[in-house]
Amino acid sequence: MQAILAAAMAAQTLLFSATAPPASLFQSPSSARPFHSLRLAAGPAGAAAARALVVADATKKAVAVLKGTSQVEGVVTLTQDDQGPTTVNVRVTGLTPGLHGFHLHEFGDTTNGCISTGPHFNPNNLTHGAPEDEVRHAGDLGNIVANAEGVAEATIVDKQIPLSGPNSVVGRAFVVHELEDDLGKGGHELSLSTGNAGGRLACGVVGLTPL
């Protein structure tokens, strides 16, 4: 009986030795030392790099294709770098020679033609004026001039028509008018609201484009 018990104990010892992994698998080389939390400290260069990691506004571009009920049509492209002014390049054809009011209107709604684009874009609730005036609508962009062939080309640089932010012009509409804009100085009853620029010949909604 004792021989049987001794043999069973020996077999159990052998089974444990065969199945138990070596202690070294559970022990890191530094397990003899107590573990403390690890804290990474950046040097002066790393701290400066972290401060310099600021997300900047990239260059933005947009376009509006002008269409109307007449033969007037055109393309307006807009470019803005970071928070700088917006550059607007205009080319319109089919106009009568001379000056034509050119404005940015409040809405990008053309369901009823250019009439449904609403009034001039005017987030500051001011009266109509010239682009260089302190008191003006943000959408007051003055006049474009058509040559003898009815083609008007212009470049406008303006700080009040950004492509991002709360006053973004994306989704609003450019409108080219029948008459000259009097820039709020004509003394007409409409001078301080529309510049007495007459009917709306063509319009187009501003949309962002790939760079």
Curated annotation (Swiss-Prot):
Cofactor note (record): Binds 1 copper ion per subunit.
Catalysed reaction equations from the record: 2 superoxide + 2 H(+) = H2O2 + O2
Binding site for Zn(2+): H120, H128, H137, D140
Co-factor(s): Cu cation; Zn(2+)
Any one Gene Ontology molecular-function term assigned to this protein's record: superoxide dismutase activity
Localization annotation: Plastid, Chloroplast
Chain segment of the transit peptide: 1-57
EC class (word): oxidoreductase
A Pfam family that the UniProt record links to this protein: Sod_Cu
EC number(s) stated in the UniProt entry for this protein: 1.15.1.1
GO cellular component terms, A-Z: chloroplast
Gene Ontology terms: biological process: removal of superoxide radicals
Keywords: Antioxidant, Chloroplast, Copper, Disulfide bond, Metal-binding, Oxidoreductase, Plastid, Transit peptide, Zinc
Top-rank taxon, per record: Eukaryota
CDD domains from the UniProt entry: Cu-Zn_Superoxide_Dismutase
Subunit structure: Homotetramer.
Function comment: Destroys radicals which are normally produced within the cells and which are toxic to biological systems.
Family: Belongs to the Cu-Zn superoxide dismutase family.
Protein name (Swiss-Prot/TrEMBL): Superoxide dismutase [Cu-Zn], chloroplastic
Origin species: Oryza sativa subsp. japonica (Rice)
